[in-house]
Amino acid sequence: MAKKIQAYIKLQVKAGQANPSPPVGPALGQHGVNIMEFCKAFNAKTQGMEPGLPTPVIITVYSDRSFTFETKSTPASVLLKKAAGLTSGSARPNTVKVGTVTRAQLEEIAKTKQADLTAADLDAAVRTIAGSARSMGLNVEGV
């Protein structure tokens, strides 16, 4: 028989840098999950990723206090800011442009994100990422 699910916890944790301090500790502690066990497993799973990139994770907590987790790819906005060399997007994206990204950069980001996007092919994924870039106040070249 399958285990009974007690809760789903959604967090963004920096790749390879999970530790018991907030936000990880309190979120897992209130469900009785072994925090250090999660931190070790998460850090091991994200070892191949670039350290420090925020990584969304969905933790499924079961009634016997065991857990499983699934990591997603880094948010597109973070990857776009990194590609454009910015710290934040534009406060007024339609009037003030703060940077530029090329089609090659968009394709690289789309390849990274394609597993988490609903796009049918790479070109559709590039257009989705280009829309995110425009909504952040970035000029998009070649799309």
Curated annotation (Swiss-Prot):
One of its GO biological process terms is: translation
Q: Which GO terms describe its molecular function?
A: large ribosomal subunit rRNA binding; structural constituent of ribosome
- A GO-annotated cellular component: cytosolic large ribosomal subunit
Family annotation (SUPFAM superfamilies):
Ribosomal L11/L12e N-terminal domain (SSF54747), Ribosomal protein L11, C-terminal domain (SSF46906)
List the InterPro entries.
Ribosomal_uL11, Ribosomal_uL11_bac-typ, Ribosomal_uL11_C, Ribosomal_uL11_C_sf, Ribosomal_uL11_CS, Ribosomal_uL11_N, Ribosomal_uL11_N_sf
The alphabetized UniProt keywords are: Methylation, Ribonucleoprotein, Ribosomal protein, RNA-binding, rRNA-binding
Share the record's PTM remark.
One or more lysine residues are methylated.
State the Pfam families in the record.
Ribosomal_L11 (PF00298), Ribosomal_L11_N (PF03946)
Lineage, top-rank taxon, reads Bacteria
Q: Which family does it belong to?
A: Belongs to the universal ribosomal protein uL11 family.
Q: Which HAMAP family match?
A: Ribosomal_uL11
Please give the function described in this protein's UniProt entry: Forms part of the ribosomal stalk which helps the ribosome interact with GTP-bound translation factors.
Quaternary structure, per UniProt, is:
Part of the ribosomal stalk of the 50S ribosomal subunit. Interacts with L10 and the large rRNA to form the base of the stalk. L10 forms an elongated spine to which L12 dimers bind in a sequential fashion forming a multimeric L10(L12)X complex.
Protein name (database record): Large ribosomal subunit protein uL11
Naturally occurring in which organism (per UniProt): Ectopseudomonas mendocina (strain ymp) (Pseudomonas mendocina)
| Taxonomic placement | Bacteria, Pseudomonadati, Pseudomonadota, Gammaproteobacteria, Pseudomonadales
